[in-house]
């Protein structure tokens, strides 16, 4: 009887045979023939642009690798030459350097691993941290969502800035342009919006294009100190980096934000700023010999920014309902909104917040021009309670600005106009908001309701800032007192009666602030201290400047208290005597010069003092007068007038002129 083979051994043999068969099949499918690879050559290179020949099948925006490891992307495709924008310093790239295709377009790493990191537009870390995992990448150029894939913008993106949330509401999925002259607070307003998202579920991406490294560092430090950096990504292409990196920076930032939007989350992109990006695009276009157009910009500059900003959208519920909001920043020259790039961006976006340099100089922060700013989404995305409370705010403030301009030429006699001016001054004080002092929607609604009810009309405009600072804690205490124990959470914004009750309670807070201000004024303290450390809310530099000025004033007061009245009077007498003697000496010198210019005038003998008719010598008279405590006429002038002179009448005229000058 033949023995039966063991079952496990048979299974192992079958498995081994199958594995061997699969390997043989794989080897049979491998092409062992040599693979040809196209290699191009650099014809010339200058200013970060390399012109390459021999790569006819290159795709637009395809990554090319130079001999030595330098990378670039194809920017323009001509019949004979390809314009390649270098992404690294061009050291080592020379004529006849070999160039190879990679077959891949520009991509950037995307995913949760970027949160809290500072990277360049290619995803390379700039914060000294570990390299990023490139398991998931996205191309920097992506198509904008189609119309059928979009939904209406209906949710507010709270910025915490009262004038923006009340008058120019930004919705999730909206593109709102922040535009203004240099140093008017554009970046500060955008950073305040980022900082306020620390209480929301919004992922923030800040893109810096052509900015100074020190300015970018201040932005990052501000977000890390006041915001939620663990939900922020910083894409930095400073002014010192290659123009190619500056050009792809906003596209890379949008791709990073789209990763979260496509997964049903909400993202916010701040591009700082598109004016510098347009200048970089013009530079690259001129270097690649594209035909220039208006203001030397190429003809596709509008299309470049349009295809970038169209990627911001609110997706439909079928695609997850995520949103991507955009706050692009643009800079104007002397407030010229009709320039080429500003008009392009205004026509592309869904509204603009215009910052005025005159308002900024008048210490109104943020310096929003109410007449030129607009949000084309507006009330559709505004909270119903905030929309109801801010209904007449813009109209009242616009009328106040017009009345204020007219009242500069004369006084007001009409009581109604005076009431409008009073209301407008309170509105201006209310919308002047320090940095990093974000307000909740509940705070904004209660403030506006109290303003509409006239609770702020009786208070000084200087006390509006303390009211705004102390209101959140006051409302929290009120809500805690009105909420029963173990009660479920309550939506106070949906209860109009509760909001009215909270607005009425603001009057009690106003009385307390006024009483504190009066008590502090009696004690010689500034009224602004009633709100606590308000001076520090305007930024470190301004707070330090205020502290220095206060120290100087305090030192002056200390010196004034240390000097007694008797010492002050003695110092005054000494100073007046010194000034008088100096004036006497000047008058005598003038008289001597005039006498010296007279014809036939003899030079007086300066060795010995000249005797006076009835008195001591001139030196003794001078000594007696110098010891006196009050100024007297100079003895030298008297001696000159009484001494005999061969000129007679001429001498008398000269002496009379010197006496008149001395008396003056």
Curated annotation (Swiss-Prot):
Compositional bias (Low complexity): 589-599
Note the InterPro entries from the entry: ATP_synth_asu-like_sf, ATP_synth_asu_C, ATP_synth_asu_C_sf, ATP_synth_F1_a_nt-bd_dom, ATP_synth_F1_asu, ATPase_a/bsu_AS, ATPase_F1/V1/A1_a/bsu_N, ATPase_F1/V1/A1_a/bsu_N_sf
In the record, which residues are listed under signal peptide?
Answer: none
Q: Which GO terms describe its molecular function?
A: ADP binding; ATP binding; proton-transporting ATP synthase activity, rotational mechanism
Return the HAMAP family for the record.
Answer: ATP_synth_alpha_bact
List, alphabetically, the NCBIfam families matched. atpA (TIGR00962), PRK13343.1 (NF009884)
* Record-given protein name: ATP synthase subunit alpha 2
Q: Which organism is it from?
A: Burkholderia pseudomallei (strain 1710b)
Name the gene for this chain: atpA2
């Amino acid at each position: 009887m033949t023995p039966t083979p063991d079952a496990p051994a048979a299974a192992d043999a079958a498995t081994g045979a199958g594995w061997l068969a699969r390997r043989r099949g794989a080897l049979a499918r491998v092409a062992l023939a040599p693979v040809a690879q196209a290699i191009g050559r650099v014809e010339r290179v200058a200013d970060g642009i390399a012109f390459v020949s021999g790569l006819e099948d290159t795709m637009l925006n395809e990554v090319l690798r130079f001999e030595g490891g330098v990378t670039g992307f194809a920017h323009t495709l001509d019949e004979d030459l390809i314009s390649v924008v270098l992404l690294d310093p061009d050291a080592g790239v020379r004529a006849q350097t070999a160039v190879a295709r990679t077959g891949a377009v520009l991509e950037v790493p995307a995913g949760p691993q970027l949160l809290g990191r500072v990277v360049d537009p290619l995803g390379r870390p700039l914060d000294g941290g570990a390299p990023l995992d490139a398991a998931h990448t996205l191309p920097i150029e992506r198509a904008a969502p189609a119309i059928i894939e979009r939904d209406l913008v209906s949710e507010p993106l709270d910025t915490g800035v009262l004038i923006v949330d009340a008058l120019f509401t930004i919705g999730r999925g909206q593109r709102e342009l922040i535009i203004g002259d240099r140093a008017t607070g554009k970046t500060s307003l955008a950073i305040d919006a980022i900082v306020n998202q620390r209480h929301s579920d919004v992922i923030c991406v800040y893109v810096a294009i052509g900015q100074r490294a020190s300015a970018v560092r201040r932005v990052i430090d501000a977000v890390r100190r006041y915001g939620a950096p663990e939900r922020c990504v910083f894409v930095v292409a400073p002014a010192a980096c290659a123009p190619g990196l500056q050009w792809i920076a906003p596209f890379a930032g949008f791709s990073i934000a789209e990763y979260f939007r496509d997964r049903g989350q909400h993202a916010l992109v701040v591009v700082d700023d598109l004016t510098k990006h347009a200048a970089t695009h013009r530079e690259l276009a001129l270097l690649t010999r594209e035909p220039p157009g208006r203001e030397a910009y190429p003809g596709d500059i509008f299309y470049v920014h349009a295809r970038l900003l169209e990627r911001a959208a609110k997706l439909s519920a079928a695609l997850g309902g995520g949103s991507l909001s955009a706050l692009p920043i643009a800079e104007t020259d002397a407030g010229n909104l009709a320039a080429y790039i500003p008009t392009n961006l205004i026509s592309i976006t869904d509204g603009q917040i215009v910052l005025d340099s005159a308002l900024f100089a008048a210490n109104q922060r943020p310096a929003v021009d109410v007449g030129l700013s607009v949000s084309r989404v507006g009330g559709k995305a505004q909270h119903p309670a905030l929309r109801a409370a801010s209904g007449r705010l813009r109209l009242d403030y616009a009328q106040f600005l017009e009345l204020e301009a007219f009242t500069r030429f004369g006084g007001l006699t009409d009581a109604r106009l005076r009431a409008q001016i009073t209301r407008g001054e309170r509105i201006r004080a209310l919308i002047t908001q320090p940095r990093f002092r974000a307000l909740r929607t509940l705070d904004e609604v209660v403030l506006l309701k109290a303003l509409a009810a006239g609770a702020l009309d009786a208070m000084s405009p200087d006390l509006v800032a303390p009211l705004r600072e102390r209101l959140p804690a006051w409302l929290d205490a009120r809500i805690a007192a009105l909420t029963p124990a173990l009660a479920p959470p309550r939506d106070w914004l949906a209860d109009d009666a509760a909001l009215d009750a909270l607005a009425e309670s603001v009057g009690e807070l106003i009385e307390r602030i006024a009483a504190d201000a009066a008590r502090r004024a009696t004690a010689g303290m500034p009224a602004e201290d009633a709100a606590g450390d308000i001076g520090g809310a305007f930024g470190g530099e301004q707070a330090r400047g205020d502290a220095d000025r206060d120290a100087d004033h305090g030192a002056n007061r200390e010196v004034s208290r240390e000097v007694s009245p008797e010492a002050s009077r003695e110092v005054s007498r000494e100073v007046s005597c010194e000034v008088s003697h100096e004036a006497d000496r000047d008058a005598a010198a003038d008289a001597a010069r005039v006498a010296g210019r007279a014809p036939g005038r003899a030079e007086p003998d300066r060795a010995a003092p000249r005797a006076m008719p009835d008195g001591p010598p001139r030196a003794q008279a001078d000594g007696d007068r110098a010891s006196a405590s009050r100024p007297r006429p100079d003895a030298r002038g008297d001696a000159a007038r009484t001494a005999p002179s061969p000129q007679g009448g001429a001498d008398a005229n000269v002496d009379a002129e010197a006496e008149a000058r001395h008396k003056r």
